[in-house]
């Protein structure tokens, strides 16, 4: 699966541009946020924009004006064909890199060195390229499609000064900025032999070997390790630019010993003479805030020329027991966004060369906003160098193209995390090492820079995520809330046990025996009038779905009306109550025992006093003396405005108002007394209405014919009667004559 993904990514731009453009230099060196934070860097990136595909329309005005540069603006495909046909060692001055020149470039580059240093640099370059091309074996005559990210070439070994061109486009017309002709000619001459040597190396299918200052072959973090992981097997040479580039990068280990002897030629007298000037130029770069590599594009080969001090290993990979230079991607949202988009950070870190005398300190990573690190990090003396292991095809499972999520495996000392880029143009998975939890001096020498992702573990983890919403364990349906006011609360035992189907798996046999049976109906008993406490009748009234009988309806006013809210009764109320009680008792004993609401007693002509009820509302006669006394009592009144505006003292006004409040509280309008007398009356309210109702003749006839009136003459009753009659006729006929006679009789009938 990783092989297919790599092939598809390597052929992206070829399919889009039909082979005329391989997608090199599509990613710019800096992101938008870094350019906004640094105006100097924003000015530099104007000339560093990626080279776009061009039609084969010939050279520009600038190239036609220059002699010997007519072939410089040929399309990329034509340049690759010429490089393939020229073979190794074929280098002509016509194919030189036209570097744009500007006033800012003249200030930044200290190219005032003598022609002696430039010529010595060219001689050393020619010698190095010839020896490398002779030692390399031909990998194929077919020009490969160069991948977007190339490994930086360390020119410290051959004494190359840190030249940083300002752009990639060969046809950039920036000659009018005011640079002197001597600086421009020396700059173009310095890249002449380098361009053709790289073109010859690319045409023969070889790659520039990388070597560390201390003799160990190490690759820059991120980009080269990813390229080695993508294609380390020689049998994929025909699958595109990825495999061919991987074979070139694997030649580093084979030629490490051969390149070691070239180190003696790099420290010549000519190179050491020009070293202080180059160091001064590098210091000027740091003062201007210009950090990062410059790329020279020549015939599809992307060469990264660093400063005078070119890095072999990024400082963030030099994780020791005392220093930790790895980025933490959980600091802020801005760091996360730049961690996904700015892949160029691996090349933007640098360390001092062994040629520099002051090797005790080095500049660490530049900050995410484009400013250098706050303080230099000291080097550890006992740990000279950390060699990064070359990852082979066995670790190809670490390249996961997961876009939505990523998985992390934690060890005792190292935690690795895979960050997936959000940029649609790169689609590459970058791996970074997060800060170690506990550093061990014995094991801090090796740093794991990739994540082995196992497919089975990922599937198990995804299955667990899918089942979390189903098997939560603690969730149970809310059955108690649906019962409402009709059901009682569940017993404590059943509540603790929960649902029968969701019991704990760790329950022992004894607990299962003590568990309450699941089919018990004790919790599902329907109660029409639940007993819930002190105000049980009020709770039953609030439940509108309960069917009440007459006694419950009659008891409701008695509960609502409290005796404490009733005003004090008149003094003669006790005598009236005793007289009424005696009359009620005599009438109830002489009655027939039937209620006044019974229709049968009314029809029979029996009229008796009803049974005594304390809460029936009766409108009988009341004692006129007491009522007249209550009604005739004057309502206390006081002119409050005149009292307040009067000349009396404040204390007198306050006493007058307090006495008025007491009079109002003591006054009674008699309404409560009327209600109390009506409830205590001995006469039934039904007798008052029945005296004029039952004398009508049609009412008596209706009660006499109650049975006939009770029958319902509806469609349902009519249908049922007809069906019953038909059933009697049909089945009686079939039982007498048999089935044959029934059918024959039906056929003879006429409609």
Swiss-Prot record:
Full protein name: Protein FYV8
Extent of Acidic residues compositional bias: 24-36, 332-347
UniProt feature, compositional bias: Basic and acidic residues: 123-134
Skewed-composition ranges (Polar residues): 187-205, 413-424, 575-584
Basic residues compositional bias, start-end: 1-11
Family listed: Belongs to the FYV8 family.
Region (Disordered), start-end ranges: 1-278, 320-428, 489-523, 564-596
Function statement: Involved in the resistance to unfolded protein response (UPR)-inducing agents.
Biased composition (Low complexity): 110-120, 564-574, 585-596
InterPro entries: Fyv8
Taxonomic superkingdom: Eukaryota
């Amino acid at each position: 699966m990783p092989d297919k993904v790599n092939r598809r990514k390597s052929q992206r731009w070829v399919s889009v541009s039909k082979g005329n453009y391989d997608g090199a230099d599509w990613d710019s060196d800096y992101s938008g946020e870094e350019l906004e934070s640094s105006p100097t860097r924003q000015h530099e990136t104007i000339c560093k924009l990626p080279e776009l595909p061009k039609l084969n329309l010939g050279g520009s005005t600038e190239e036609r004006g220059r002699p010997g540069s007519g072939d410089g603006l040929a399309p990329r495909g034509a340049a690759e064909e010429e490089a393939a046909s020229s073979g190794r060692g074929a280098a002509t001055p016509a194919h030189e890199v036209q570097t744009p020149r500007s006033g800012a470039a003249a200030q930044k580059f200290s190219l005032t060195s003598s022609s002696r240093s430039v010529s010595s640099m060219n001689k050393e370059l020619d010698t190095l390229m010839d020896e490398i091309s002779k030692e390399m074996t031909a990998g194929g005559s077919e020009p490969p499609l160069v991948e977007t990210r190339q490994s930086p070439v360390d020119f410290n070994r051959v004494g190359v000064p840190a030249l940083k061109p300002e752009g990639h486009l060969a046809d950039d017309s920036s000659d009018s900025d005011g640079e002197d002709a001597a600086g421009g000619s020396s700059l173009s001459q310095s890249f002449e032999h380098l361009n053709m040597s790289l073109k010859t190396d690319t045409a023969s299918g070889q790659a520039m070997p990388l070597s560390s200052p201390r003799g160990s072959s190490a690759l820059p973090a991120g980009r080269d390790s990813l390229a080695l992981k993508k294609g380390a097997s020689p049998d994929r040479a025909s699958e595109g630019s990825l495999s061919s580039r991987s074979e070139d990068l694997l030649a580093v280990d084979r030629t490490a010993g051969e390149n070691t002897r070239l180190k003696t030629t790099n420290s010549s007298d000519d190179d050491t003479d020009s070293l202080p000037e180059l160091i001064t130029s590098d210091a000027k770069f740091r003062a201007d805030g210009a950090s990062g590599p410059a790329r020279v594009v020549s015939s599809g080969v992307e060469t990264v020329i660093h400063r005078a001090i070119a890095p072999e290993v990024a400082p963030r990979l030099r994780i020791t027991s005392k220093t930790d230079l790895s980025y933490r991607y959980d600091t802020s949202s801005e760091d996360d966004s730049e961690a996904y988009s700015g892949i160029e950070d691996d090349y933007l870190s640098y360390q001092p060369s062994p040629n520099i005398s002051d090797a005790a300190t080095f500049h660490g990573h530049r900050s995410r906003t484009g400013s250098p690190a706050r303080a230099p990090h000291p080097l550890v003396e006992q740990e000279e160098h950390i060699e990064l292991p070359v990852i082979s095809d066995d670790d190809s499972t670490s390249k996961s193209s997961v876009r939505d999520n990523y998985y992390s495996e934690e060890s005792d000392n190292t935690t690795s995390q895979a960050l997936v880029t959000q940029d649609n143009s790169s689609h590459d998975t970058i791996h970074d090492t997060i800060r170690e939890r506990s550093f061990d001096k014995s094991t801090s020498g090796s740093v794991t820079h990739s994540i082995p992702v196992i497919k089975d573990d990922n599937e198990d983890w995804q299955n667990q995520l899918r089942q979390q919403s189903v098997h939560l364990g603690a969730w149970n349906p809310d059955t108690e809330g649906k019962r409402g006011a009709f059901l009682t609360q569940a017993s404590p035992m059943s509540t603790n046990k929960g649902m029968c189907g969701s019991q704990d798996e760790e329950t022992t046999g004894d607990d299962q025996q003590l568990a309450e049976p699941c089919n018990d109906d004790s919790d599902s008993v329907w109660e029409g009038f639940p007993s819930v406490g002190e105000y049980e009748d009020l709770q039953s009234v609030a439940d509108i779905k309960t069917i009440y009988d007459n006694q419950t309806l009659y008891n409701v006013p008695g509960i609502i009306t409290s005796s404490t809210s009733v005003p004090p009764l008149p003094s003669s109320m006790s005598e009236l109550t005793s007289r009424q009680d005696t009359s009620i008792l005599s009438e109830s004993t002489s009655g027939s025992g039937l209620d006044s609401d019974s229709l049968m007693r009314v029809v029979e002509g029996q009229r008796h006093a009803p049974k005594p009820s304390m809460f029936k509302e009766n409108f009988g006669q009341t004692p006129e003396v007491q009522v007249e006394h209550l009604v005739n009592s004057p309502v206390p009144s006081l002119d409050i405005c005149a009292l307040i505006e009067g000349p009396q003292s404040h204390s007198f006004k306050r006493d007058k108002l307090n006495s008025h409040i007491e009079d109002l509280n003591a006054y009674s309008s008699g309404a409560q007394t009327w209600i109390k007398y009506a409830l205590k009356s001995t006469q039934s309210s039904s007798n008052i209405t029945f005296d004029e109702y039952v004398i009508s003749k049609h009412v008596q006839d209706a009660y006499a014919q109650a049975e006939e009136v009770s029958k319902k003459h509806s469609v349902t009753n009519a249908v049922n009667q007809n069906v019953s009659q038909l059933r009697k006729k049909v089945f009686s006929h079939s039982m007498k004559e048999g089935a044959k006679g029934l059918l024959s009789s039906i056929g003879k009938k006429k409609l």
